């Protein structure tokens, strides 16, 4: 991945010392089981971002002026477990620098590392998983760090709220919390699903967004597309409500599997990322991601996992 700034913004808004936002690319596709190519997702996303207008009409803002630092990509791919450990370490390093940390993958197994880092750094974390798949397997193909296992650890260690689910294995029913999972077919006839989902969330929220949550008519370029998904404006409405009512401490976007002949999905992913930032900073009077936002002091929290520093 060539060294560049996010969306081609000037260096003035891209320095680590002055940027409030950090973007970590993770071009990993080691455990996907159908369409390959999610490792090309971050590059396609960044290319699309460079061709996007940076003024957001809805919020009347230019969120990039808060500073967006594009970090070096996490390229560890020797094993799923080592990739997760590397993502965990890099994410945690930037959280401790008091940045609003965002991650773009890559297949959804990447989120095991990001969720682990945020859970160690923020009190009473709610993980909002927007996804077509439940991803609640404890292990798949010999690894607990498979993309089919993305939400298992979160289901055990955080307040997990799942939205848009329309594909799962019957064994995952024994793991899921039926009161905190919103199936797509039920959402389609429930005018209050957004409010009901938000009522289940605590103060501190991390959003993990698998792009296959969208209907494939809107987002065909993903590893495992499923019919019956979310549409653009209902998704934005839901996200806007979360950012307004909760303290979103970070987010990731996963599973862009770019198609050389159709760039529309790349552009949608780029717009989604920028929209989420615009909502976050539209609702933040003074950006403080430290103790007042539920941040755990590093010396008060013993890591539950092997801790590596990636500076």
Each PLM stretch: what is its role?
Residues 2-311:
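Conserved alpha-helical scaffold segments that buttress catalytic/binding sites
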């Amino acid at each position: 991945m060539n060294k560049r700034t996010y969306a081609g913004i000037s260096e003035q808004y891209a320095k680590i010392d002055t940027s409030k936002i950090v973007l970590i690319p993770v071009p990993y596709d080691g455990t996907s089981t159908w369409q390959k190519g999610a490792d090309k997702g971050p590059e396609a996303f960044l290319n699309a971002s460079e061709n996007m207008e940076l003024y957001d009409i809805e919020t009347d803002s230019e969120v990039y002026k808060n500073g967006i630092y594009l970090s070096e990509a996490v390229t560890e791919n020797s094993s799923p477990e080592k990739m997760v450990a590397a993502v965990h370490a890099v994410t945690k390093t930037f959280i401790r620098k008091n940045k609003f940390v965002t991650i773009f993958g890559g297949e959804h197994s990447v989120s095991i590392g990001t969720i682990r880092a945020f859970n160690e750094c923020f009190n009473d974390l709610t993980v909002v998983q927007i996804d077509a798949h439940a991803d609640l397997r404890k292990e798949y193909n010999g690894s607990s760090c498979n993309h089919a296992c993305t939400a298992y650890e979160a289901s055990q260690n955080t307040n997990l709220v799942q939205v848009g689910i329309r594909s799962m294995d019957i064994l995952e029913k024994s793991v899921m919390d039926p009161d905190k999972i919103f199936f797509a077919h039920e959402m389609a006839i429930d005018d209050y699903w957004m409010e009901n989902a938000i009522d289940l969330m605590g103060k501190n929220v991390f959003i993990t967004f698998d792009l296959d949550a969208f209907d494939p008519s809107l987002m065909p370029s993903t590893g495992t597309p499923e019919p019956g998904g979310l549409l653009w404006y209902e998704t934005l409405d839901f996200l806007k409500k979360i950012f307004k009512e909760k303290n979103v401490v970070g987010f990731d976007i996963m599973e862009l599997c770019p198609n050389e002949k159709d760039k529309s999905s790349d552009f949608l992913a780029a717009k989604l990322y920028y929209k989420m930032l615009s909502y976050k900073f539209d609702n933040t009077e003074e950006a403080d991601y430290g103790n007042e936002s539920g941040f755990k002091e590093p010396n008060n929290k013993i890591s539950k996992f092997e801790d590596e520093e990636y500076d």
